[in-house]
Amino acid sequence: MKLAIVAGDGIGPEVVAQAVKILDVVQPGVEKTNYDLGARRFHATGEILPDSVIAELREHDAILLGAIGDPSVPSGVLERGLLLRLRFELDYHINLRPGRLYPGVKSPLALEPGNPEIDFVVVREGTEGPYTGNGGAIRVGTANEVATEVSVNTAFGVRRVVRDAFERAMRRRKHLTLVHKNNVLTFAGSLWWRTVQEIGEEYPDVELAYQHVDAATIHMVTDPGRFDVIVTDNLFGDIITDLAAAVCGGIGLAASGNIDATRTNPSMFEPVHGSAPDIAGQGIADPTAAIMSVSLLLAHLGLDDTASRVDRAVEGYLATRGNERLATAAVGERIAAAL
């Protein structure tokens, strides 16, 4: 396996170091290449993501990312120049966000005994919607200013995400929920709903449901156990995945995969939390989400048994840690010891 590592900014290098520690335990011999991308490189060279680096990244099997963002860089510069560019250049049309409440982890929800287990995954479209930069503004700064952000949805883009979601549902509990707002967003909503129905005919064993996005947020709080696989567009997915993380114990336990399902490009895996510059360098950042990202990476590369080993070790750690606050390295050491 050839792995590109982008530790990034803030706590990124600290949590990635622990994720790599776990990877070395379960999958020795990985060929690793570190890339200095983020605020430090931007300040030193003015570069964000050179074309030459993109070409090098394409030669790897996967990418492990820490975190990007620093208050010394204007907002949006690194996010658009690095993260969004990677998303479009490497065709990350699927953003995968598991949502599971692990034993021993507290949820802010008042869950009743006997409620269904919270264990779902959100398959979010990653390259379309209103994030394509298709829009503009006129008469800026005047009382007559007009601004638009056009949401782009293509049959090609929707179909490939929906098919991936059905495939995941077949490997899980065989239930898929489309989340959209087709009573108001009638054109895009119709495309999504017709596509789900059409492709769903190829998966008769998968039970299909639909929820408006506002109803889905209610049910994610009142009855999250109803969900198995959720498929949705870029914007709605961006919103409900953060709610899902909160329901499952916080964004510090949320891992994600940015996936090119065609496997033409290396997919990228990362913890969802930000760079947290206020605690960077103190050795107190929780690396659990970064370690969970390694599990997603391994599963994507077909190493399911190895990924399951990491999952079980993380589950065991979370079940026993209680209110204990461990240093970053200590978390990695404890999970590594369990392996």
UniProtKB/Swiss-Prot annotation:
The keyword Magnesium applies. NAD(+) binds at G274, S275, A276, P277, D278, I279, A280, G281, Q282, G283, I284, A285, D286. Its cofactor is Mg(2+); Mn(2+). One of its GO terms (biological process) is L-leucine biosynthetic process. GO terms for molecular function: 3-isopropylmalate dehydrogenase activity; magnesium ion binding; NAD binding. Its EC number is 1.1.1.85. Mg(2+) binds at D214, D238, D242. It catalyses: (2R,3S)-3-isopropylmalate + NAD(+) = 4-methyl-2-oxopentanoate + CO2 + NADH. Substrate binds at R87, R97, R124, D214. It is found in: Cytoplasm. Keywords: Amino-acid biosynthesis, Branched-chain amino acid biosynthesis, Cytoplasm, Leucine biosynthesis, Magnesium, Manganese, Metal-binding, NAD, Oxidoreductase. It comes from the Bacteria. The record marks Y131, K181 as: Important for catalysis. SUPFAM superfamilies: Isocitrate/Isopropylmalate dehydrogenase-like (SSF53659). The keyword Nucleotide-binding does not apply. Belongs to the isocitrate and isopropylmalate dehydrogenases family. LeuB type 2 subfamily. Catalyzes the oxidation of 3-carboxy-2-hydroxy-4-methylpentanoate (3-isopropylmalate) to 3-carboxy-4-methyl-2-oxopentanoate. The product decarboxylates to 4-methyl-2 oxopentanoate. Homodimer. NCBIfam families: PRK03437.1 (NF002898). This is 3-isopropylmalate dehydrogenase. It comes from Mycobacterium ulcerans (strain Agy99).
